[in-house]
Structure formats: structure tokens, C-alpha cells
Amino acid sequence: MACLLPAARLPAGFLFLVLWGSVLGDKLLVVPQDGSHWLSMKEIVEHLSERGHDIVVLVPEVNLLLGESKYYRRKSFPVPYNLEELRTRYRSFGNNHFAASSPLMAPLREYRNNMIVIDMCFFSCQSLLKDSATLSFLRENQFDALFTDPAMPCGVILAEYLKLPSIYLFRGFPCSLEHIGQSPSPVSYVPRFYTKFSDHMTFPQRLANFIANILENYLYHCLYSKYEILASDLLKRDVSLPALHQNSLWLLRYDFVFEYPRPVMPNMIFIGGTNCKKKGNLSQEFEAYVNASGEHGIVVFSLGSMVSEIPEKKAMEIAEALGRIPQTLLWRYTGTRPSNLAKNTILVKWLPQNDLLGHPKARAFITHSGSHGIYEGICNGVPMVMMPLFGDQMDNAKRMETRGAGVTLNVLEMTADDLENALKTVINNKSYKENIMRLSSLHKDRPIEPLDLAVFWVEYVMRHKGAPHLRPAAHDLTWYQYHSLDVIGFLLAIVLTVVFIVYKSCAYGCRKCFGGKGRVKKSHKSKTH
């Protein structure tokens, strides 16, 4: 009995992993997406490395966040751009979201802006798949599995080329999940990307959702048709990307305290909140800021790594609003310092966001509604003022607003008064704090931490060389078989045939029964005349 007591004190996640066991020392190839997408993947990669796995991260030689690390080996490949060009493109991508446009032109502007980054990713992928030295290195290393972000499908193509079981880390997609994961997605209650609808839609919203679902197929083709050409050249056969997306496992950064409930497949594992690391001690600098805030506490403000500066007029409006509240504002901002910045607002180029949100003095979180920030807000129970800018951020903000955990502002149209009122609302109205604390409690009430769960399933795929028993047979069906159109057509043909036979039989019977009598009567009349 005494032997069991120390084990009982171990973290549940650690015990779970130890009990299941793992063949340590497997070789994992990681094909990440640069930028904020890398942050969640990095946490998983580091934990896998700590468990003894040999990890190689494939990176373009010019990148933003894919730096050296003691946890993995980097294998770089050449790309046709330099660091200044890369930074300029990302800076342009972030800053363009503050440009006003008409509602009719907004979708086109969003598409063109997204293509700034998507084209850069394509150039990177093209260089990789045409670099014979890198491909030779990958073939020779005999990896056990491939771990990738499928938003840009270079890793998907490599998994097919190297014949490796693959694991996808995924949060959102310009096209809905069913297009690549074969997961059912009823348009009646599963809102499509960019619609900003909830799961309770009015008839006009369901109509718009239905149309958006149709347009997603066209969008998918526009975004990824070039990758199909790359894949066909590399694999020496005609391929389609949906056919290549037959991975072993999806690690979805989902948690249904945040997402709307929807159907899923057995090879989909939910790991929302992996980026909510254990809160560490604040540095002396930030500890001093927090302590100086007094009873009013702090507000954390960050619009993410993609936004480096804000137009001067808008920045001054924001600064004016922040100066009207009693809290201390910690604003992550690398642009020009607003001339009207108040004494209660501190500009920093970087801040320990999760650690600050986890401090008892955190009163509110001003965020662009990126999924990483949303989950950190949920984990730490901090109500939010949301200023979504692009991508899935509008939908994320709608989800939190629907749950009563935050207020959404249109960053292009809001005034200083709007921001001031929103901050005072989420800070002073207790319902927002109560709602976010309830979400936090639900999120944390689980048998294993999402990071431990992600590590387990990556090891599971490496240990068993894939997970084909979890793969839905829907991947093997044509579109008309998936929707049973051939069965419906066959049954319809039978019904129509039966109806036709019955109709003809009745017509023939009527002619026999009534047609003969008519002729007899007619013949009788002619004889009497």
C-alpha cells in the first residue's frame, strides 16, 4: 500500500502516459507553418523531445519564428526571398486590415490580402519540393511519422511522397473541415467560416450559410489548385489534394466550451488549450507594473504578432480610451508611440501574455481574437474586449460574445467612447467575469491535460505506424457515392418504372374494359339506322 502513495501524488497526465507506455526514440519529421501557427506545435514538439524522440523540423532558411532549439534538429532548405521581403509581406498583411473598404469590396480585399501570405508559403513549398538535396535527406532518414499543419499542404504532399503516417495539427481552414476530414457538417446548424453566425441561425442566415458552403468548394480550388500541380510533378501521377488528405490523425485545437457542437470523426482528437502553459513567475519589470496598479488591477492588450503598427489616428483614439479607465494598461505595441498616451498605459514590445492573464490582478483582456489568445483568456478566466481583424477572428469573437464572456468591437468603426464603454462593461458587469469563469472551469475539468493528450496520440501513431482503423471509409468514396446519389437514382428509377408499368397497365385495362363496350354500342347504333 505504501508503494502506491507516491504514485498517487504524480500528475494525472504523467501517470496516463507512463501507464500507456511509449517506445521512445522514434524519429518524427515536423513540417510546420511559420508564424503564430507554430506556437502550439512547438509546445507539442518540445514535450515529445523531452520523452526521448528524435525530432527534425523542416524549415525555410528564411523565416520569422522557426529558430534554433535544444529540443530538435533543424533542416533548412533554400527559398527565393530574403528576410526583409518576408517581413515586409507580413507587415503589409497585418497593416492592410486597417484599410477601410465598402462591404461589397471587403471580401475581395480580404482574399487579396490573404494571398500575400499564401503566395509566400507557396514559393517556400515549391522550393522545398524541387530541392533534390533536401528530398534525398528526408528519404535517407527513415522517419516513423510526419507531423504537420495542413493549412498549407506542403507537409501533406511530403507525407505521401515519403509514405509516412501523418498527424495534422489544425484549428481553422478557409474551407470547412468536411472537405478534407470527411466529417459531416450540416449547414442547418454548423456555421461556415467568415459568416460570423452562431449555431442558432435564422432562415436568412441559414440561406447565406448554404450559399457559403457551395462557395467554399470554389475557394478551396482557388487557394490550393497550384499545390496539386506541385504534388503531381513530385509524385509523377495526377493527384488531387482531397485524396492526399487521408492522414492518420487530426489533433484539433478545439474545445467545445469555445466551439459550437458539431459532428466529428473517430480520428479527431481535441486538444484546445495546449498553449496555456503553467503560469510562471513574472519578471521584475512586469511584476513592478502589476504591483503598481493597486486595487484597480491591470488590463492586458495585444493584437497579435501580425500587427506591428496601427494608423496614427486609430492609435490615438485607442490611447485616449485607455487613459479614461483607472486600470493600468500593458499594451504590446511596436508602432509609433501615440502622442496622447496616458500615464496609466505602458507600451512594451513583448509581454508574457499568459502569465499576466493568470495574475489575480488581471481585470480584462483586449485581444484580436486569435485562437491562442482566446484560449489563454478562457484558461485564466479573464473577460475580453475583442477587436477581430482577419481570418477566423470574427468567428472566434462571435463565439465568445454568444457565451457572454466578452464584447466585440469593429476596430475600423469604433470610437474612443466605444472602447471605453466596452472596457467598463466587461470589468464592472459581474456577469462577464462569471461567464468566463464558468467556461474556464469547464475547460479545466478533464481527465488529462490537452498537451499530454496530444503527445500520447503522436506517439500512438508512431508506435503503430499509423491509425488506419480510425480512418473513415468516406475517403474511398466518390462525391456521388458519399451522398448516395447513385442509390437514390437507382431507387428513383425503380419507382418511376413501377409507376410507368402501373400506369400502362391501368390504361390497357381501361381500354379493354371500356373501349370494347364503346365499340359495341357504336356498332349497334349503326345497325338500327
UniProtKB/Swiss-Prot annotation:
GO terms for molecular function: enzyme binding; glucuronosyltransferase activity; protein homodimerization activity; protein-containing complex binding. The chain crosses the membrane at residues 487-503. Its EC number is 2.4.1.17. It catalyses: glucuronate acceptor + UDP-alpha-D-glucuronate = acceptor beta-D-glucuronoside + UDP + H(+); (5Z,8Z,11Z,14Z)-eicosatetraenoate + UDP-alpha-D-glucuronate = O-[(5Z),(8Z),(11Z),(14Z)-eicosatetraenoyl]-beta-D-glucuronate + UDP; 15-hydroxy-(5Z,8Z,11Z,13E)-eicosatetraenoate + UDP-alpha-D-glucuronate = 15-O-(beta-D-glucuronosyl)-(5Z,8Z,11Z,14Z)-eicosatetraenoate + UDP + H(+); (E)-ferulate + UDP-alpha-D-glucuronate = (E)-4-O-(beta-D-glucuronosyl)-ferulate + UDP + H(+). Residues 1-25 form the signal peptide. GO terms for biological process: 4-chlorobiphenyl metabolic process; cellular response to glucocorticoid stimulus; cellular response to hormone stimulus; liver development; response to 3-methylcholanthrene; response to Aroclor 1254; response to lipopolysaccharide; response to peptide hormone. The keyword Transcription does not apply. GO terms for cellular component: endoplasmic reticulum; endoplasmic reticulum membrane; protein-containing complex. The modification Phosphoserine is found at S76. It comes from the Eukaryota. InterPro entries: UDP-glycosyltransferase, UDP_glucos_trans, UDP_glycos_trans_CS. The keyword Repeat does not apply. It is a single-pass membrane protein. It is found in: Microsome; Endoplasmic reticulum membrane. Glycans are attached at N281, N291, N429. Its main location: other. It is an enzyme of class 2 (transferase). Keywords: Endoplasmic reticulum, Glycoprotein, Glycosyltransferase, Membrane, Microsome, Phosphoprotein, Signal, Transferase, Transmembrane, Transmembrane helix. Belongs to the UDP-glycosyltransferase family. UDP-glucuronosyltransferase (UGT) that catalyzes phase II biotransformation reactions in which lipophilic substrates are conjugated with glucuronic acid to facilitate their inactivation and excretion from the body. Essential for the elimination and detoxification of drugs, xenobiotics and endogenous compounds. Involved in the glucuronidation of arachidonic acid (AA) and AA-derived eicosanoids including 15-HETE and 20-HETE. Conjugates small planar phenolic molecules such as 4-nitrophenol, 1-naphthol, and 4-methylumbelliferone. This is UDP-glucuronosyltransferase 1A6. It comes from Rattus norvegicus.
